[in-house]
Every structure is written in structure tokens, then in C-alpha cells.
Design a protein with these regions (language model features):
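Basic, amphipathic alpha-helical hairpins
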Residues: 1-2, 16-28, 48-52, 69-78, ...
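Basic/polar phosphate-binding segments, predominantly the helix-turn-helix DNA-binding elements
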Residues: 31-60, 84-106
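Terminal helix-turn-helix DNA-binding modules in bacterial transcription factors
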Residues: 50-90, 112-116
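Hydrophobic, helix-rich cores of sensory/ligand-binding and other regulatory modules
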Residues: 1-11, 30
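Short helix-coil-helix linker/hinge
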Residues: 9-14, 54
């Protein structure tokens, strides 16, 4: 049983590493991660949530949005479209909506405040 727990943890850790290094891929998804590490998507979904306390897609969103905050601060001249694309969003509106939902402020306002 302990081996099983270790193997589960390892799969989740490999998933996390993959997400953190490839979050900018537009096609990043539960299915892509599952295929990459060679497990069934619903199995990965279950073990990921147990281990991390949130769904894989929520983890991906958080990873992308944390990166967006960095970019908005470090590259004040980049457009929201450029930033959205560089973190894996093909739709700038969806990116802005998610950002505002998570941080309570729009990315453009966040970027503006950093410029002052």
C-alpha cells in the first residue's frame, strides 16, 4: 500500500512539474497531462484533487494567473493579448475574466497600478 501512495504522489508531482513548465501551451489540459504521464484522465483527476486539494484545471489556472501577475509587473508595455497568449490563453476576454475572478481586479488595472 505504501508503494501505491508513493507512486500516486510521484504521478501528481510529475503532473505538477509538467504544468509548471508547459502552462503556456494553448492545448494544456487534463487529457494532455494524463496522456503525457501515461494514465487515465479520470484517475489523474481523482489523485490530483486528493493530493493537491484542488482540481488540475484550477491548479493550471492558478499557475497561469500567477505568471500573468509577474508579466504584468515586469513588462508594463506588453499588451493584455500578448500576456494572455504567453501564458496559454487564446482568448484575452476569458483571461481577463479569470484574472478578475481570482484577484478582484482586472489585469489592465493591475498593470496600470504597477506602472505608477
Amino acid at each position: 500500500a505504501e508503494n501505491n501512495v508513493r507512486s500516486t504522489k510521484k504521478k501528481v508531482n510529475v503532473s505538477v512539474d509538467f504544468i509548471e513548465s508547459k502552462y503556456s501551451r494553448i492545448d494544456m489540459s487534463l487529457n494532455l497531462v494524463a496522456d503525457t504521464i501515461g494514465v487515465n484522465a479520470s484517475y489523474l483527476s481523482n489523485i490530483f484533487k486528493k493530493e493537491k486539494g484542488c482540481s488540475l484545471s484550477k491548479y493550471l489556472t492558478q499557475t497561469r494567473l500567477e505568471q500573468a501577475k509577474k508579466y504584468l509587473t515586469e513588462y508594463p508595455d506588453k499588451t493584455l493579448i500578448e500576456i494572455a497568449e504567453s501564458i496559454g490563453y487564446s482568448d484575452v476576454y476569458y483571461f481577463s475574466k479569470n484574472f478578475k475572478k481570482y484577484y478582484g481586479i482586472s489585469p489592465s488595472k493591475y498593470q496600470e497600478e504597477r506602472k505608477m
